[in-house]
């Protein structure tokens, strides 16, 4: 369940979906939107050295329309009866996860449906789900500040436990090089 725009990335995605035989019934095409993407180009010269260039972001800067939002919610309701787990990747400020869509996802979780949520900006708004923040997202959801820079391992564990209690959720917090 997602949306693609009417741009070249959307056309590439459609081609990949079609060639792989993927069911596209719940992929909404929105011609006036960008297909969101975070691209991490890898650079390699004549030597064997390979390194990552700065990330290229293709993002929308306006919310989806109410019509698209309604279609997302309709599709969410349709698929929930045919899947065992809903994995939510809420990574863009102006992606398909609006407050109304998130409320629908939370309602599914509260009804006993298994929902796993990973959100760059809104992890603290998901309740009754399995949450997968990184240490910074978890810290911000609990303390709403930038104090994570000086935090140690134990403080991150405490933040994850507080988030779990506050949101009635199981939390799997990734800790970069320190694991999860």
Pin down the residues of each PLM region.
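Ribokinase/PfkB-type carbohydrate-kinase core domain
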Residues: 1-180
């Amino acid at each position: 369940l997602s949306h693609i725009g009417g741009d070249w990335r959307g056309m590439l995605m459609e081609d990949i979906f079609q060639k792989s035989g993927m069911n596209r019934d719940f992929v909404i095409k929105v011609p006036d939107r960008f297909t969101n993407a975070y691209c991490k180009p890898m650079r390699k010269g004549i030597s064997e050295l390979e390194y990552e260039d700065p990330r290229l972001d293709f993002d929308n800067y306006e919310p989806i329309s109410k019509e698209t939002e309604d279609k997302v919610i309709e599709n969410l309701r349709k698929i929930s009866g045919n899947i065992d787990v809903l994995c939510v990747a809420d990574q863009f400020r102006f992606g398909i996860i609006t407050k109304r869509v998130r409320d629908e996802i939370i309602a599914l979780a509260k009804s006993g449906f298994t929902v796993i949520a990973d959100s760059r900006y809104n992890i603290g708004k998901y309740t009754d789900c399995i949450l997968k923040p990184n240490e910074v997202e978890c810290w911000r959801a609990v303390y709403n500040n930038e104090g994570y820079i000086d935090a140690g391992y134990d403080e991150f564990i405490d933040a994850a436990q507080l988030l779990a209690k506050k949101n009635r959720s199981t939390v799997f917090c990734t800790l970069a090089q320190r694991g999860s």
